[in-house]
Amino acid sequence: MKVESRENQPSAASADRSGADQESGAAERPDPSKKTDDGKPHAPAENGQKPPSNAKDPSRPRRKKARRACFACQRAHLTCGDERPCQRCIKRGLQDACTDGVRKKAKYLHDAPDGALMPGVGGNFYSSNNNNSSMRNNLPLSRNGANAVNANAQQNTGANFYPTPQSTSYNVYQENPINQSSFTSQSPVSPTFNLKTNPTARTNSLSSVGQQPPTTTGVSGPNPQNPFAGALFDPSDPALFNFDLSSMNFENRYGALEFGMLGHMATGAGDSPSDSATQRGSMGRSGSAQFSNTPITGQPGFGESPGGQQPFMFGDPLLNEWPGGQASGQAHVNVGGVYPQSGQGSVIPGHLSKTDAPHAFTIESGPNFASPSATTSPQMTSGFDDHALNNAVAKSNGMANGQRPTISTPSLKHQSLQIGAKRRPRNPSSIYESVKEPYAYTNRFHNLTACIQRRFSPQKTLQIAKALASIRPSFIATTKTLNRDDLIFMEKCFQRTLWEYEDFINACGTPTIVCRRTGEIAAVGKEFSILTGWKKDVLLGKEPNLNVNTGGSSLPGSGTTSRSFTPRGSVGESTAPGRPQPVFLAELLDDDSVVEFYEDFARLAFGDSRGSVMTTCKLLKYKTKEDMELAQSDDNQRWNNHLRKGGIASEAGMNQLGFKDGKVECAYCWTVKRDVFDIPMLIVMNFLPCI
């Protein structure tokens, strides 16, 4: 009995091992040619079973690690292979159900489709399940029985369609102009891309029957056999966006695609006429992408560029050239046939109605790229499109009607397209090339002294002189070691800093001025001119200063009778009134405000480098002799009419502040900026009127 039990043990053990192999596939059968640890070949067991292999044997064949296990091996936590079906599923008889297992996605990928994360799938994720040619050929696409799918005349034409997330129906648009349209749903915001289709899909694309009038057909219903029921583009296909994933420092493919899609949407947000994104099918202002077919080849494409030209996203040279081209008379041809000519009675194929679309603004663009309003019609032309060029291109492309619609944006006026030419150059290198001489601060300080003596009384002139005398030794100490090159460099620093501040002044809605340390106005904002009536050219010395408003506390020339002072300057440099020269800050404030300013300036000039002063003042309005006579004649009547019409609610109302006495009471804050030599370089002042 014991002998029989021993003989039965190997068979039972082998049966258990065979069952384990069938269930888990963990055990392996060694090669008979391989040797054991003692150098002897494996000998078959008495019952015909091979002995198990030694896992520590260095000559044991190593199994290649699979990129992704199948579902069965993943569930059993077993080693799988790259082939499908894998060897373990074949042994277990599960070769028909051997598919790649689904990995647990990260939190930021929870909304990503499973197929988009599978390696090697690419753009075939959606198209592989929706490219049944027999279904497309037999699919009726007719709303009222007028249109059907013609499989014989479909080789060079494509279909334009839109996904609508609100319902399960899709609008399919034919290539011919559509006479009537009924768009009831709004498409989601989608980026621009090329719709890659295989030859089977291109051969079986949609077209309208030549004898039937072109109408809008619809494909509806969540039919699983509907080839359009799936998604219309694959976000995991990098060819759709034409950017290299390997060049992006992303460990995840889907994250790189998401980053590229956001950049692609940002570059296509400006709905400009000749923008290459528009030619490829730019984002519509109603939040939907514009599908179009190339008239050159007739092949389907999502806004493909002409002549098989590959679209591009980053470094697009056409993104910023269209304002200059339009202003110079160059016409930009509509590549995808997006906008039809006005008067043809047709609507835009593949474009939804804009009546329900919100207003949009172009991202990171100037006023030249202002987005059109939702009520404007894209069929209208701006009046400066070159139709002759459009006709010539249309004839060269073999179009029957000989007309090519042009992309036009009616809300962009022709005058606004020429604004860019008047803007200053964005390259500050011209500053370093133009400054050749140091600024004559000595002469300017003498001019300031003469201006103060002409306007203020001797008592207030003495107060200002004491304040300036307190900082005079500091100026001498900081400038005595500077040579001519240092002074030229100082002026370059000033001009470069002023060049930077001009952008801030234009972007800020607060009345702002920038002065030199002498008090001369160097930059001024539009709001300050509106508030005080001082024109920018007058403040900068480009036009004569004809102001006679000095606040009324002292008469002009009252300070010049007490002493005979002749300012030092070059020949012909006169301080006579009316000579075009920059206006001093002392001419913009009333007497008390000027004295208070210079007392604060004496404490702040060489004191706290980051300090500022916040106080109140009274600005003097710009008034000529004619303005003073007019104000005295109908002062009360104009002021009462102004208050009756709504106060200071508009630009004209702000200009009327201080109309009665010629002074505008303001609260202002100012600070001193120093240069590299720690010398006061400029004074930045912000004003707010006290209402």
From Swiss-Prot:
InterPro entries, per the entry: ERT1_acuK_gluconeogen_tf, PAS_13, Zn2-C6_fun-type_DNA-bd_sf, Zn2Cys6_DnaBD
GO terms for MF: DNA-binding transcription factor activity, RNA polymerase II-specific; RNA polymerase II transcription regulatory region sequence-specific DNA binding; zinc ion binding
DNA-binding feature ranges: 70-98
Keyword terms of this UniProt record: Activator, DNA-binding, Gluconeogenesis, Metal-binding, Nucleus, Transcription, Transcription regulation, Zinc
GO cellular component: nucleus
Subcellular compartments: Nucleus
SUPFAM superfamilies: Zn2/Cys6 DNA-binding domain
Region Disordered, annotated ranges: 1-63, 179-228, 269-310, 549-579
GO biological process: cellular response to starvation; gluconeogenesis; positive regulation of metabolic process
Start-end of Polar residues biased regions: 179-223, 273-297
Compositionally biased residues, Basic and acidic residues: 26-43
Superkingdom to which the source organism belongs: Eukaryota
Bias kind Low complexity: ranges: 550-562
Pfam families: PAS_13 (PF24990)
Known function: Transcription factor which regulates nonfermentable carbon utilization. Activator of gluconeogenetic genes.
UniProt record similarity statement: Belongs to the ERT1/acuK family.
Protein name: Transcription activator of gluconeogenesis acuK
Gene: acuK
